[in-house]
């Protein structure tokens, strides 16, 4: 995971923080030029900046959390794998002639335990994003994922999946290649695997593209990630014929972690560093590793039939509601 100092990419709601940071830098520069001690004032302003950052990030709207989830510097699947694994070897190919770079995976060790890790992979710049199709896999990506999961099942290795996609690619070519079948096959087969499966939404969890690697014993979610049946922009365009109503759609869709936990769709929320995972990737990775190990320890104490039954029951409960007569 890169640690080189780079100019921050600020989101719209972070502008007050940028203004305060500029003011601190100006005061510090003037003090150095004039030999004046303003350390007390600097400390007060820095404390105010920390407080303001905390206030902003604890009161984000769903559409603002979506901006954080889509941040260009948000840690990716490969970032997390490299940060949490003792060793790692990427495996390629779906054994049908393809190797989709939008979905990566391989074998590694997590605190000495052999595991298979796989997930969606977005690019870091325009060229990389085009090569990885902006993290939207073709059917071959899901077939590659299933091949790796079958490998994990054969050799009794837990499966860790990392979800970060706007959705599966919906182009004509993908449909010709059987996009719906590839995702449906994964859904069915993941329910039948004997090994522990832990799925983590690290950024965007979009539609069937997320579900294609999202059936597990545990569904974890980073605090500022989103998980949704459709992007708010698509939902607004469909329901109101106006993509500009995406913020209202984001509220209605219940895409944020706290709503999803309350609804029983996800199992655990992973706290992020103040400012989002991109503000301190190593801290976010440390949190992820700790939570994965805790959940693996619990799941390893269950038998394969117990895991399969609980996995099935978990998903059967999603969407259950009680009608109240008026």
Curated annotation (Swiss-Prot):
Pathways per UniProt: Lipid metabolism; malonyl-CoA biosynthesis; malonyl-CoA from acetyl-CoA: step 1/1
Pfam families: ACCA
GO molecular function terms noted in the UniProt entry: acetyl-CoA carboxylase activity; ATP binding; carboxyl- or carbamoyltransferase activity
GO biological process: fatty acid biosynthetic process; malonyl-CoA biosynthetic process
Transferase recorded as keyword: yes
UniProt-listed Gene3D superfamilies: 2-enoyl-CoA Hydratase, Chain A, domain 1 (3.90.226.10)
Compartments where located: Cytoplasm
Superkingdom field: Bacteria
CoA carboxyltransferase C-terminal domain sequence ranges: 45-298
EC identifiers of the protein: 2.1.3.15
The entry's keywords: ATP-binding, Cytoplasm, Fatty acid biosynthesis, Fatty acid metabolism, Lipid biosynthesis, Lipid metabolism, Nucleotide-binding, Transferase
GO cellular component, one term: acetyl-CoA carboxylase complex
EC class name: transferase
InterPro entries recorded: Acetyl_CoA_COase_a_su (IPR001095), ClpP/crotonase-like_dom_sf (IPR029045), COA_CT_C (IPR011763)
Catalytic activity, as annotated: N(6)-carboxybiotinyl-L-lysyl-[protein] + acetyl-CoA = N(6)-biotinyl-L-lysyl-[protein] + malonyl-CoA
General function of this protein: Component of the acetyl coenzyme A carboxylase (ACC) complex. First, biotin carboxylase catalyzes the carboxylation of biotin on its carrier protein (BCCP) and then the CO(2) group is transferred by the carboxyltransferase to acetyl-CoA to form malonyl-CoA.
Subunit structure: Acetyl-CoA carboxylase is a heterohexamer composed of biotin carboxyl carrier protein (AccB), biotin carboxylase (AccC) and two subunits each of ACCase subunit alpha (AccA) and ACCase subunit beta (AccD).
Recorded family membership: Belongs to the AccA family.
HAMAP family in the record: AcetylCoA_CT_alpha
Protein's name in the database: Acetyl-coenzyme A carboxylase carboxyl transferase subunit alpha
């Amino acid at each position: 995971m890169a640690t080189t100092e780079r100019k921050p990419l600020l989101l719209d709601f972070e502008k007050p923080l940028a203004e305060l940071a500029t003011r601190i830098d100006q005061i510090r520069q003037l003090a150095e030029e004039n030999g004046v001690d303003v350390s007390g004032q600097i400390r007060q302003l820095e404390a105010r900046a920390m407080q303001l950052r905390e206030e902003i990030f604890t009161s984000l709207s769903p559409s603002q959390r979506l901006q954080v989830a889509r941040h260009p510097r948000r840690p990716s699947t490969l970032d997390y794998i490299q940060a949490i694994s003792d060793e790692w070897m990427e495996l390629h190919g779906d054994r049908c002639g393809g190797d989709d770079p939008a979905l990566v995976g391989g074998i590694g060790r997590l605190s000495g335990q052999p595991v298979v890790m796989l997930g969606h992979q977005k690019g870091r710049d325009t060229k990389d994003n085009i090569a990885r199709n902006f993290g939207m896999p073709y059917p071959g990506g899901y077939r590659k994922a299933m091949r790796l999961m079958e490998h994990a099942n054969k050799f009794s290795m837990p499966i860790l999946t990392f979800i970060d996609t706007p959705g599966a690619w919906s182009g004509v070519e993908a449909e010709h290649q059987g996009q719906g079948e590839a995702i449906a096959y994964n859904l069915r087969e993941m329910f039948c695997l004997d090994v522990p499966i832990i799925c983590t939404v690290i950024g965007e969890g979009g539609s069937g593209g997320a579900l294609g690697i999202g059936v597990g014993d545990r569904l974890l979610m980073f605090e500022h990630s989103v998980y949704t049946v459709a992007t708010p922009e698509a939902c607004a365009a469909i329901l109101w014929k106006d993509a500009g109503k995406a913020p209202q759609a984001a509220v209605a869709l219940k895409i944020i972690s706290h709503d999803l936990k309350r609804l029983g769709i996800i199992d655990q929320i992973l706290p992020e560093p103040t400012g989002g995972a991109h503000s301190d990737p190593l801290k976010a990775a440390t949190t992820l590793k700790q939570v994965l190990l805790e959940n693996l320890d619990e799941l390893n104490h269950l038998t394969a039939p117990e895991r399969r039954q609980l996995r099935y029951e978990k998903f059967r409960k999603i969407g259950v509601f009680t009608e109240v007569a008026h």
